[in-house]
């Protein structure tokens, strides 16, 4: 991602890059979205509720405020799970914008109710509606609840808010 960002900048494009966690903000054009406390809170709540991707309200609002300032022509998403962004708030914001969206999928989390790798256990519930998830103990770990059916429905609704003309999916 950073190579693409730097290549765009070298060509005179006003490019910005944001990432979820682990590295501190470098400058105005290269910033971390999440606070450490936000990641821990999101991860902890998700472990109890199986709602990974639906917390981080404060960090998401701050990120979207930055996008409001930038007013991007294109938003290129990569993995949007990892306890740092609220996918509902992100996609509801994207639905109100005129920008194009490119989403590079590095795993299957976007199309399942819980897991990023359904093929590990040969599960095909994601095709018709997740439930009784066999991978709650794997990433993203959920200890007490199985919300895979609700998550699958919510993600399906959110991730189809943008028309095919506005969003391009890429799978390496």
Residue ranges and their predicted role:
Residues 2-172:
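Catalytic cores of nucleotide-sugar-dependent glycosyltransferases that transfer UDP/GDP/TDP-activated
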């Amino acid at each position: 991602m950073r190579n693409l960002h730097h290549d765009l900048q070298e060509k005179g494009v006003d490019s910005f890059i944001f990432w979820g966690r682990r590295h501190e903000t470098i400058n105005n054009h290269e910033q971390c979205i999440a606070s450490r406390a936000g990641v821990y809170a999101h991860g902890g709540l998700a472990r109890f509720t199986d709602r990974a991707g639906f917390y981080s309200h404060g960090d998401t609002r701050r990120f979207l405020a930055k996008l409001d300032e930038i007013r991007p022509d294109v938003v290129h998403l990569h993995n949007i799970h990892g306890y740092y962004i609220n996918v509902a708030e992100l996609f509801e914001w994207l639905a109100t914008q005129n920008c194009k969206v490119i989403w590079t999928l590095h795993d299957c989390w976007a199309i399942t109710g819980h897991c990023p790798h359904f093929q590990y256990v040969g599960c095909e519930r994601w095709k018709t509606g997740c439930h009784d998830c066999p991978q709650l103990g794997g990433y993203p770990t959920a200890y007490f609840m199985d919300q895979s059916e609700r998550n699958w429905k919510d993600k399906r609704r959110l991730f189809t808010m943008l028309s095919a003309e506005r969003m391009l999916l890429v799978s390496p």
